Amino acid sequence: MAFGRRSEMADQWLFKSETYDNCNCAMNCGCQFNLPSTHGYCQSAFIGHLVEGHFNDTPLVGLNWAALYKWPGEIKDGNGKRQIVIDERADATQRSALETIVSGEACAPLSNFFSVFASTCSAFCETLFLPIDLEADLEGRTARVEIPGILKSKAGPKINEFNGEPFHIALARPSGSFEFTYAELGLGTTSVTGDMEMAFENSWAHFCVHHFNQDGLVRERSRLTAWLGA
């Protein structure tokens, strides 16, 4: 069964990733609050680690991935640019499977954020296969990422200016989201070189579980909500 064919809906797959995203917006990203972007244009870097996953019989657990995006204006206006980076540890079959999922070609159109974002892009850079060094604590709202020669990023919680303690803020999306149902929020700083050159500092960061399958977003209570109790 060939990868990369959106029409081949017989593929059965699961993508459950602990993901860190840093974009250039302030801490009220328009994507999540149905608002215009902070600066009138959008740039974003997603980096994740597969805690569960497969594409048909191909296992994906333990692999890392990244997706970099740039738009000259609002995302909805299109003309975006995308580059995918896949963990160099993946074998040929895993690389093909991950690229198919992250490109948005493995699901029903517009049923997850990979597909939605792909629909707004007109330029697609060559996929890279590189080491992705990712350390992320979703509950702690911290991350450190390095993709040699391409990306450096770090993130942490926003600090409460009144008492100097981490400011705990989170976002629930009970319906209407094509990306997550719950995310922890913080601030990140990212520098990207190469085809997707961009940089932003102390800007929106979110930490979430991306849980998708061939039908779209899987609506399951995230482990990040454990502090809410039963």
Predicted regions and their residues:
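Short, Lys/Arg-enriched N-terminal segments with co-localized hydrophobic residues
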Residues: 1-8
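N-terminal ordered "arm"
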Residues: 10-55
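Generic recognition of cysteine residues
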Residues: 23, 29-31, 42, 107, ...
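Short, surface-exposed loop and linker segments with low hydrophobicity and enrichment for Pro/Ser/Thr
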Residues: 32-41, 74-78, 128-146, 187-192, ...
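Aromatic- and glycine-enriched beta-alpha-beta binding-site module
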Residues: 40-111
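Low-complexity, flexible helical/coil segments
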Residues: 57-64, 119-124, 179-186
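Charged linear interaction tracts used for macromolecular binding and regulation
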Residues: 80, 84-170, 174
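Extended, charged low-complexity segments
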Residues: 159-230
